[in-house]
Amino acid sequence: MTDADPTLRPDPLPEDNDRALRPQALDEFIGQAEARANLRIFVQSARQRGEAMDHTLFHGPPGLGKTTLAQIMARELGVNFRMTSGPVLAKAGDLAAILTNLEARDVLFIDEIHRLNPAVEEVLYPAMEDFELDLVIGDGPAARTVRIELQPFTLVGATTRMGLLTTPLRDRFGIPTRLLFYTVDELFEIVSRNARKLGAPAEEAGAREIARRARGTPRIAGRLLRRVVDFAVVEGDGRITRELADHALTRLGVDQLGLDGADRRYLRLIAENYSGGPVGIETLSAALSESRDSLEEVIEPYLLQQGLIQRTPRGRMLAQKAWTHLGLDAPRPPGQSDLFG
């Protein structure tokens, strides 16, 4: 297996929308303790004051719960939840249609907000600051600006690329919240709970095996769990043991660190063809027939987080942990002789 496994990628898949597995309240949400504690304060304050909660920006790697937290916020505020995404809002009129239909204190969630059209973003500024919408009607000399009053609302933005947000947009969010990768213990809790909901109870060692290979991401943990449940039903007795989880995940090409075929191919290329690096990203892109964006956004973040690779001014290099994981010996630096040589 050499291709990127969709199961191990944090991007959403249709099967991720299983409402039964999603937490419905902050108390049910596992992980992100600091973010949850702060959000609980902000939600309670907004409810007691009877005002719209301040605009909130969730940023961090994909699959960590940004959409789920936004839905929980709306539920705990007792208001409606509207959802869209940056690429969908092609024209200012698209955004205006959504904003003018919001009721007082509603939550509007914009996923991938870093991909907003600049013209749409300009319309968003007065809407966020003054709850007003300035629309241009007509063309040429006959054009005129119409100001529309909006109901106070809460904008919740989500981005995986904080650096791509313009400064004016970023500064208009009063509650910036970074979401972090989950610990194995947190993922273990999530896997154990969801296994019970799926009717395939997991032994502690079985749930922990799935958690260890889930790349710190609940979305991936949920997908791996579903696949392991399939194996438990067909090849086992319906229970998830450590042996069954290990067997199923190995069959799926997921190794002990949660790497898939594409990850291992990336590491092995640097090890075998470039002596561990440094090697430039463009060279890797050509050798792997992958786009640079795909390498930088999909494959490299987890390898960096695990300390398997290093980014240097001269290119990518393998860390000692990667050599060990591949079962290869790292080459000696040039000019370094053997201890007894």
Swiss-Prot record:
DNA repair among keywords: yes
Main location: cytoplasm
Gene name of this polypeptide: ruvB
Region (Large ATPase domain (RuvB-L)) residue spans: 1-182
GO MF annotations in UniProt: ATP binding; ATP hydrolysis activity; four-way junction DNA binding; four-way junction helicase activity
Family classification: Belongs to the RuvB family.
Residues at which Mg(2+) binds: 67
Catalytic reaction list: ATP + H2O = ADP + phosphate + H(+)
Short name of one Pfam family: AAA_lid_4
Keyword Cytoplasm: yes
EC number: 3.6.4.-
Residues binding ATP, per UniProt: 21-22, 63, 66-68, 129-131, 172, 182, 219
Region annotation (Small ATPAse domain (RuvB-S)) ranges: 183-253
Free-text comment about domains: Has 3 domains, the large (RuvB-L) and small ATPase (RuvB-S) domains and the C-terminal head (RuvB-H) domain. The head domain binds DNA, while the ATPase domains jointly bind ATP, ADP or are empty depending on the state of the subunit in the translocation cycle. During a single DNA translocation step the structure of each domain remains the same, but their relative positions change.
Keywords: ATP-binding, Cytoplasm, DNA damage, DNA recombination, DNA repair, DNA-binding, Hydrolase, Nucleotide-binding
Origin species: Ruegeria pomeroyi (strain ATCC 700808 / DSM 15171 / DSS-3)
Region (Head domain (RuvB-H)): 256-341
Described function: The RuvA-RuvB-RuvC complex processes Holliday junction (HJ) DNA during genetic recombination and DNA repair, while the RuvA-RuvB complex plays an important role in the rescue of blocked DNA replication forks via replication fork reversal (RFR). RuvA specifically binds to HJ cruciform DNA, conferring on it an open structure. The RuvB hexamer acts as an ATP-dependent pump, pulling dsDNA into and through the RuvAB complex. RuvB forms 2 homohexamers on either side of HJ DNA bound by 1 or 2 RuvA tetramers; 4 subunits per hexamer contact DNA at a time.
PANTHER family: HOLLIDAY JUNCTION BRANCH MIGRATION COMPLEX SUBUNIT RUVB, PTHR42848
Binding site for DNA: 292, 311, 316
Cellular compartments per GO CC: cytoplasm; Holliday junction resolvase complex
BP GO terms, sorted: DNA recombination; DNA repair
Listed name of the protein: Holliday junction branch migration complex subunit RuvB
Cellular localisation: Cytoplasm
InterPro entries assigned to the protein according to its UniProt record, in alphabetical order: AAA+_ATPase, AAA_lid_4, DNA_helicase_Holl-junc_RuvB, P-loop_NTPase, RuvB-like_N, RuvB_C, WH-like_DNA-bd_sf, WH_DNA-bd_sf
Entry superkingdom: Bacteria
Quaternary structure and interacting proteins, as annotated: Homohexamer. Forms an RuvA(8)-RuvB(12)-Holliday junction (HJ) complex. HJ DNA is sandwiched between 2 RuvA tetramers; dsDNA enters through RuvA and exits via RuvB. An RuvB hexamer assembles on each DNA strand where it exits the tetramer. Each RuvB hexamer is contacted by two RuvA subunits (via domain III) on 2 adjacent RuvB subunits; this complex drives branch migration. In the full resolvosome a probable DNA-RuvA(4)-RuvB(12)-RuvC(2) complex forms which resolves the HJ.
